[in-house]
UniProtKB/Swiss-Prot annotation:
PANTHER family: NADH-UBIQUINONE OXIDOREDUCTASE 75 KDA SUBUNIT, MITOCHONDRIAL, RESPIRATORY NITRATE REDUCTASE. It catalyses: a ubiquinone + NADH + 5 H(+)(in) = a ubiquinol + NAD(+) + 4 H(+)(out). Belongs to the complex I 75 kDa subunit family. [4Fe-4S] cluster 1 binds at residues 101, 105, 108, 114. CDD domains: fer2 (cd00207), MopB_Res-Cmplx1_Nad11-M (cd02774). It is found in: Mitochondrion inner membrane. It is an enzyme of class 7 (translocase). The gene is nad11. GO terms for cellular component: mitochondrial inner membrane. It comes from Dictyostelium discoideum (Social amoeba). This is NADH-ubiquinone oxidoreductase 75 kDa subunit. Residues 223-279 form the 4Fe-4S Mo/W bis-MGD-type domain. SUPFAM superfamilies: 2Fe-2S ferredoxin-like, 4Fe-4S ferredoxins, Formate dehydrogenase/DMSO reductase, domains 1-3. Keywords: 2Fe-2S, 4Fe-4S, Electron transport, Iron, Iron-sulfur, Membrane, Metal-binding, Mitochondrion, Mitochondrion inner membrane, NAD, Oxidoreductase, Respiratory chain, Translocase, Transport, Ubiquinone.
Amino acid sequence: MIIRFKINEIECEVNEEKEDITILQACTANGIEIPRFCYHEKLTIAGNCRMCLVYVTNEEKLLAACGIPLDENFDDESIETEIDEILKAREGVMEFLLINHPLDCPICDQGGECDLQEQTLAYGLDTGRFYIKKRAVEIKTFGRLIKGIMTRCIHCTRCVRFLTEIAGVNELGVLGRGYNMEIGTYKKNVMIESELSGNIIDLCPVGALTSAVYAYKGRPWELKNIKGIDIFDTLLTPINYQVKGGEIFRILPRINDRINEEWITDKVRFHYESYKIIEKIRKETPSYKIQANKFIELTWKTALKMVFKVLLNKKNKVDLIIGSKINSTNLRIYKELMNRLGSKNYITENGLMFKKFNYDLRENYINSNDLYNVDKNDLVLLCGINLRVESPLLNIKLRNVNFGDDEIESVKKIGIIGNKFDWKHESEYIGATLNSMLKLFEGRLPYCQQIKKSKAPLIIVGPSLLTRISLTLQEMRAIFMKACNLKPENILIITQGANFGMALEEGLFKEKFSIGGNVLYSIDSNEVQVTNKINYVIYQGIINDKFENKIDLYLPSKHYFEDFEGDREVYMNTFGQRSEIEKLSISKGNKIKENSMIGYIQLMYLNNKEMTRKEKEQKDIKLSYREMKKEEKRKIKVNKYLTINNIIENYYMTDINIRLSKNLMITGQLRKEKKIMEAGIWKNRKCI
């Protein structure tokens, strides 16, 4: 329905499709600016600040534009946003908002991007009339990551609404009323337990909530934005690195409504301090272990000669494990290297959890649904996944889905198979073993009827289930489609680690791969278990905290965001969406090389050895059609009493860059010590 109306004597129109459109939204769509503090398009309407007052004909009083919906009655009415009455009202509102606000703008971290500063300049008075003593509020502790100087707070309640409505935690609220109103936790010194708590820093229009990690370190006009991605999430959330002088000062989200809207996880927002620690403790030159815990430095020429000697030794069986952060260019280089050596013992670290692969067709491993359309699903079944820690952004997408009105109120729209976890909506817990899954396939559960009646169900399969059953992603999807009568877009398979789809596209997986060689060549992979069968370990990467004592030859390489030749590189998420990242250089040492350069040197050496590709091409022939059909008809043997446990035990310990971040590590520890925090024992810890 098209609604026509007048704004400042200008005829405008807006197309009202689904939800009611407010005056504020209509004005914004037509390029007319209306100031606001409490309104945010992703949150519910509060109407606290009253900055968006407008005049509507035939109305006695000024109206808050954020809370008045447009309808067909506005055809004969006009909206005014710039008359004297409104300008005076805005001056009065600004005066009230600034009554208790401290004059500490020069030291406030919000300076330069503060909505209060900008709107005071545009709409406020040039003199103050308040001479009574200002109210001061004590600095509040919200954990290791967020700094709360609540004297600056203007009570817009954006933070409260975000945590309650989107993050699903009720740990912030409004206490008191009138002059005594405050925003805080209901108990003192309580940490906000959410994987997305840092987003309230971006939402705060003033300097009340700021980053404790970024405090007093920089100004926004000094920082340069460089495009990046959240490498710790399979969604590959777009982010901005804010850099100055080769050092990362902040990480902020980039708006993308199809993936993350405008939110990012705490893990990617605050992990950047680990890069500074890495640069201090990492080695800049290759090194070789001569005895236990004793290394000698080598030149690159000597180190690469040792690598060639190991790789070309026919007695050695080399296993190549590539980290999940490695880009597509490097994946191709090292696959080519192993093929030239006549070996197919290569895989990525996130592929080690799977027992079988099929990457003949792209649809076998890429999800055909779209995260943007998740609000159309009327039923969700979670199988072997804890969304809160494995995919927090997908978690809030689903948690805020409007499942619609149902005639039967007792029907539960969310089912969980696997470990329980906190969920906003009412859910039905089905079971934790594979036996529950088999009952679902056989139609012996009451929940099967709900799936049958559902018009748009969504089944999400996580890595915890995929690691328990020897199935390809295609076979897993086919079983759900046949058992529950679903389409491919009704099934979403979440894998672990970034660039998994790109590695499959490059064919970097092998059927029934297992680490069985005597030489391990690890490229930026820390999650490999080094067995006693392995007598020689080559580690090429940044730093290793899992099997550092077992490394025989160390080759230092650069971070993933500086490890490519041009200015940009492409990664691909679990939905097949490609994301570009820009080159960012933070490594201090000039002797540190890119993985691509090391790989090219090795290939050039092999070319000089005049190795042909005929044998490689013959070995690359895939299974014939008959063999593939025979493989598809095989019987699957599973232990039905096997429990589907979560693969992530600690959200803040999943990567070397996370483990080296002091603030994230302490945050993880404090969550475990929740009972101690409630008792007040942690009060003496440094939390700001």
